[in-house]
A protein has these predicted regions:
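The feature captures the beta-strand-to-loop junction immediately N-terminal to the Walker
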Residues: 39-41
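Conserved ABC transporter NBD signature motif
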Residues: 62-74
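Catalytic Walker B motif of ABC-type/P-loop ATPase nucleotide-binding domains
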Residues: 156-159
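Conserved ABC ATPase "signature" region
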Residues: 102, 109-127, 179
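Conserved signature/switch motifs of ABC ATPase nucleotide-binding domains
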Residues: 130-133, 151
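Helix-to-loop junction immediately C-terminal to a conserved catalytic motif
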Residues: 54
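Short helical segment in ABC ATPase nucleotide-binding domains corresponding to the A-loop/adjacent helical element
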Residues: 82, 94-102, 112, 116, ...
Length: 252
């Protein structure tokens, strides 16, 4: 796909569970090549939103579109990266990366070529025959990233992918993820509880409101890359987002 032409859009999307309003009238757009982070207090609907976009659930009302086409279910145009890795323990690193390609019916030689490309991209070529229980948490998450990219999705959906990692590994994985994003030119929609992570990664930060189950604020992050967490402007933006989240928590 031409990286200058794609977009992903939510139009007035709502989700209700047995009378409980999880989301109410959510609208926003992710543009081609854009890195968007979603933040907000617990219970504001971040994970529900991601499940709707992934096609794992259907909205009660509203429309989700990819390049103008309505999303009605899961599809290979959306790649998922999970916090809990979700790797098959009986498959090698290569086998996990090739799983989606097998479902597509690609020949073994084609699968191997694609897997090798993404093994190299995430720096795991020497571990291609290893099993998940032989890998560190950061390495497992790299496998998850490679598996998502191997299917060549238009957008990557990431649900707290680094939340289970220690602080040092998490920072390292953020750097790695940015490098991969720059290389692949994918749209990224990244859910996180960490405001610091959102400010470090995102072109745009979407703050969800637990009060209204909607988007409270969309903040454009124009801090130059590479970003310095100790920089005054970085700290200022982080504090601005934290202040709004604290207001949401206080309301609840």
């Amino acid at each position: 796909m031409d990286v200058n032409s794609g977009y992903f859009r939510l139009e007035n999307v709502s989700k209700t569970y047995n009378g409980f309003i999880a989301l109410s009238g959510v609208s926003f757009t992710v543009n081609a090549g854009e890195f968007v982070c979603i933040v907000g207090p617990s219970g504001c609907g971040k994970t529900t939103l991601l499940r709707l976009i992934a096609g794992l659930e259907q909205p009660t009302s509203g429309i989700i579109k990819m390049d103008g086409k309505v999303v009605t279910g899961p599809g290979s145009d959306r790649g998922m990266i999970f916090q809990e890795y979700a790797l098959f323990p009986w498959r090698t690193v290569t086998g996990n990366i090739e799983f989606g390609l097998e479902l597509k019916g690609l020949k073994k030689s084609e699968r191997g070529e694609i897997a090798e490309k993404y093994l190299n991209l995430v720096g795991l070529t020497q571990f291609k025959n290893s099993y998940p229980n032989e890998l560190s948490g950061g390495m497992k998450q790299r496998v998850g990233i490679a598996r998502a990219l191997a299917n060549d999705p238009t957008i990557i959906l990431a649900d707290e992918p680094f939340g289970a990692l220690d602080a040092q590994t998490r920072n390292q994985m953020q750097e790695e993820f940015l490098r991969i994003w720059r290389a692949e030119h994918k749209m990224i929609l990244f859910v996180t509880h960490s405001v610091d992570e959102a400010v470090f990664l995102a072109d745009k930060i979407i703050l969800m409101s637990a009060q209204n189950r909607n988007v409270r604020e969309i903040l454009k992050n124009e801090l130059p890359r590479p970003r310095d967490r100790t920089d005054h402007d970085f700290t200022q933006l982080r504090n601005e987002v934290l202040k709004m989240i604290r207001e949401e928590i206080a309301f609840n």
